[in-house]
């Protein structure tokens, strides 16, 4: 079977733990995920099964939505409360100035520096491994976009709740740090829940315990809304051998599905160049 599960990951469990448990529960040979969710965080994790593990790239560019809680005036090495507390401040804060800081990031594109404790690679080495060895490196910033950033509670006991809808590659831990910097203090992540990946919603996800085999979204079902190209038997043989297609078969700027004359799914094609297309996945 090839497809996807929408899983509600609990706190204190790694994304790898979820993969392992699903593999064990259903006796699948190949299982993967489309993007790590930190152990501190709960919420939506998309799990790929079978050949669909090769489709993780489809989710990479999707925006993500989170809700959670920031903690101010405390500095942790990991930028969340699971790390080592390095320093504290007693900076007086108000709802008014916190709201102004939130507003300054709303619908904003900016260069964000990922946390040192992250899976980002520097010269082929994951930064969290360097951090554990106390190795200091220059971390290149990456451009991110904050589509929506909202304070959802009153400030109380150095804490405030938030809602964030962000682009690919955005670290909420870094956002906590950067929000607090504008307030001349420290910021860390206290709680985090991922509620959406693109149009895939947490409300449609299940816990590992409640997950059933018929919850698997088949790869063919996932592509049901894509444009399709139906080819004859001769061209289908070429497609199965990895042949590129061009304007002689189709003209489009979007990915599409190739089907045979019986409307069976054969391959997923993506754009390579203008009027040139290549296969990225075979059903």
From Swiss-Prot:
Give the family, as the similarity comment puts it: Belongs to the pseudouridine synthase TruB family. Type 1 subfamily.
Quote the CDD domains the UniProt record gives.
PseudoU_synth_EcTruB
Q: Which reaction is catalysed here?
A: uridine(55) in tRNA = pseudouridine(55) in tRNA
What's the EC number here?
Answer: 5.4.99.25
* Annotated protein name in UniProt: tRNA pseudouridine synthase B
Kindly list the residue ranges recorded as spanning the membrane.
none
Any one biological process term the GO annotation gives: tRNA pseudouridine synthesis
Residues of the active site? 38
- Keyword terms, alphabetized: Isomerase, tRNA processing
Q: Specify the species.
A: Onion yellows phytoplasma (strain OY-M)
Classification of source organism: Bacteria, Bacillati, Mycoplasmatota, Mollicutes, Acholeplasmatales
Top-level taxon in the UniProt lineage: Bacteria
The Gene Ontology terms for molecular function here are: RNA binding; tRNA pseudouridine(55) synthase activity
Q: InterPro entries attached here? A: PsdUridine_synth_cat_dom_sf (IPR020103), PsdUridine_synth_N (IPR002501), tRNA_psdUridine_synth_TruB (IPR014780)
What is its biological role?
Responsible for synthesis of pseudouridine from uracil-55 in the psi GC loop of transfer RNAs.
């Amino acid at each position: 079977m090839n497809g996807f599960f929408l899983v509600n990951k609990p706190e204190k469990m790694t994304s790898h733990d979820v993969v392992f448990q699903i593999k064990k529960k259903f006796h699948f040979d190949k299982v993967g995920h489309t993007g790590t969710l930190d152990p501190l965080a709960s919420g939506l994790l998309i799990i790929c099964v079978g050949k669909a593990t090769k489709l993780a790239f489809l989710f990479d560019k999707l925006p993500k939505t989170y809700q959670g809680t920031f903690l101010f005036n405390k500095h942790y090495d990991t930028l969340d409360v699971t790390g080592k507390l390095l320093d504290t401040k007693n900076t007086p804060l108000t709802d008014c100035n916190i709201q102004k800081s939130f507003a300054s990031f709303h619908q904003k594109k900016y260069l964000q520096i990922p946390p040192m404790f992250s899976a980002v690679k520097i010269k082929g080495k994951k930064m969290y491994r360097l951090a554990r060895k106390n190795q200091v490196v220059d971390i290149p910033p990456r451009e991110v976009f904050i589509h929506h950033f909202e304070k959802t509670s009153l400030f109380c006991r150095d804490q405030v709740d938030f809602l964030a809808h962000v682009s690919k590659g955005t670290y909420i831990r870094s956002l906590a740090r950067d929000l607090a910097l504008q307030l001349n203090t420290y910021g860390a992540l206290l709680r985090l829940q991922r509620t959406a990946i693109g149009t895939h919603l947490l409300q449609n996800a299940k816990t590992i315990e409640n997950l059933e085999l018929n919850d698997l979204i088949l790869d063919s079902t996932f592509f049901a809304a894509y444009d399709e190209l139906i080819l004859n038997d001769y061209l289908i043989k070429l497609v199965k051998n990895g042949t590129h297609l061009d304007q002689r078969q189709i003209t489009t700027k979007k990915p599409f599905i190739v089907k045979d004359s019986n409307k069976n799914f054969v391959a997923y094609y993506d754009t390579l160049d203008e009027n040139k297309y290549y296969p990225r996945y075979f059903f």
